[in-house]
């Protein structure tokens, strides 16, 4: 079966960099060099890495959102990994940095999103890069500008681990920028699986089938299967594996949060909880 590519993309998976202050300080240093040299260019105000291009519609957002969370859940952190930025150069009309260390993350995102039936990646080879600025046509034709850009030096590393402020986001092409970030459709901290921890080994220790209808009413339609056996399997599986759907239900269902906090359920009204939500 032929693979569909996002050669006319309308969204992308974003790895924002503004929250890494040390990197941004050095990144802006490069931009100041360009301006001081008088290079006619448009400065990038939201530093980032585009990890995958997408050709999707709003009805695909949820599938891509879930795929991102599954990639995060399946990451094997070890001691973390490093992202290396180096070699300022011209790529097309842009001045960019080479980016190394995110190739596996790119591949995982492409495969997980594609497994959801969504169109992603491009037919041309993906090149990890971080845009510094975009040159005007006039600036690109000036040999002195090209020579200056090719002489620039940059070498910086970021270590990514579960406590890092690293995020994966769905962004629409042309989205507005504010304070160094793109407006996002969805955004997930890459260490999110450690944000909430299931309080018991088994879901059955704090609630039962009697709770499913209460929880279902607080979720979006279709989140939990209508069949109680299927719904229980889905919820308990994600609860016991501390994966994305557990956190989704924890965020959306106040009843489920209280059950986790109390280590017990109240679906039959046997007690009044003394625990208040934060």
Swiss-Prot record:
Gene3D superfamilies: Cyclic phosphodiesterase (3.90.1140.10). Transmembrane segments: none annotated. InterPro entries: Coronavirus_NS2A, NS2A-like. Pfam families: Corona_NS2A (PF05213). Belongs to the coronaviruses ns2a protein family. This is Non-structural protein 2a. It comes from Bovine coronavirus (strain 98TXSF-110-LUN). The lineage of its organism: Viruses, Riboviria, Orthornavirae, Pisuviricota, Pisoniviricetes.
């Amino acid at each position: 079966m032929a693979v569909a590519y996002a050669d006319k993309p309308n969204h992308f998976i974003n790895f924002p960099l503004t929250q890494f202050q040390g990197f941004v300080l050095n990144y802006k240093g490069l931009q100041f060099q360009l301006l001081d040299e008088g290079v006619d260019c448009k400065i990038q105000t939201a530093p980032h890495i585009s990890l995958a291009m997408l050709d999707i519609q709003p009805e695909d957002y949820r599938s891509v959102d879930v795929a991102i969370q599954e990639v995060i859940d399946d990451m094997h952190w070890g001691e973390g990994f490093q992202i290396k930025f180096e070699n300022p150069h011209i790529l097309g009309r842009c001045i960019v940095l080479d980016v190394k260390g995110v190739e596996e993350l790119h591949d995982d995102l492409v495969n997980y999103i594609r497994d959801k039936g969504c169109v992603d990646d491009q037919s041309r080879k993906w090149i990890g890069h971080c845009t510094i600025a975009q040159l005007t046509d006039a600036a690109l034709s000036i040999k002195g500008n090209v020579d200056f850009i090719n002489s620039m030096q940059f070498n910086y590393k970021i270590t990514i681990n579960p406590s890092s402020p690293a995020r994966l986001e769905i962004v629409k092409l042309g989205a507005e920028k504010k304070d160094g970030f793109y407006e996002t459709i969805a955004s997930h901290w890459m260490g999110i699986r450690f944000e909430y921890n299931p309080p018991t080994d088994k879901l059955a220790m704090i609630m039962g089938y009697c709770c499913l209808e209460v929880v279902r009413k607080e979720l979006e339609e279709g989140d939990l299967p209508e069949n109680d056996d299927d719904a229980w399997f889905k919820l308990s599986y994600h609860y016991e594996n501390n994966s994305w759907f557990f956190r989704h239900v924890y965020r959306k269902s106040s009843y489920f949060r209280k059950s986790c906090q109390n280590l017990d359920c109240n679906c039959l009204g046997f007690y009044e909880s003394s625990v208040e939500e934060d």
